[in-house]
């Protein structure tokens, strides 16, 4: 039976080491089967629904990747900064994965920027409000790191 570790016993250095050991590459995932299913098994409504969902995830991951740096800068300890930097890399990796899927499977966009632009109209009002607030929080923290 695996030993359990209490959350307060896990250090930021432990979290960083776990992150290093568990990496995967967004650029190496093969979407050939996904493309085949997209083209031949999904109905038009399935494709529209899936693209809407993937677009929300894509924009969310991109927004968090863009907005984590002030939180990293404001972290009080170096170990916290290093761990938070891993989270920023993970958000970027997730955005790259969704961008590739949207481009290679759904056929939207030619690169990350154009895929973001092409899927922008799919974002709902509520989604936009949440991530606009994240943008503002990042801007506020950039100006004053003492804000919680």
Residue ranges and their predicted role:
Residues 1-148:
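Non-heme di-metal
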């Amino acid at each position: 039976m695996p030993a359990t570790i209490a959350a307060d016993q896990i250090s930021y250095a432990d979290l960083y080491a776990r992150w290093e050991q568990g990496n995967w590459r967004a650029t190496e995932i093969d979407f050939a089967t996904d493309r085949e299913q997209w083209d031949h098994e999904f109905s038009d409504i399935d494709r529209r629904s899936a693209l809407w969902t993937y677009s929300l995830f894509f924009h969310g991951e991109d927004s968090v990747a863009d907005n984590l740096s002030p939180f990293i800068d404001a972290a009080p300890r170096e170990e916290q900064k290093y761990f938070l930097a891993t989270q920023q890399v993970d958000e970027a990796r997730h955005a790259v994965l969704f961008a590739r899927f949207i481009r290679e499977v759904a056929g939207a966009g030619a690169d990350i920027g154009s895929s973001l632009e092409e899927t922008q109209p799919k974002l709902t009002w509520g989604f936009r409000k949440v991530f606009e607030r994240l943008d503002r929080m990042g801007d506020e923290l950039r100006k004053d790191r003492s804000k919680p």
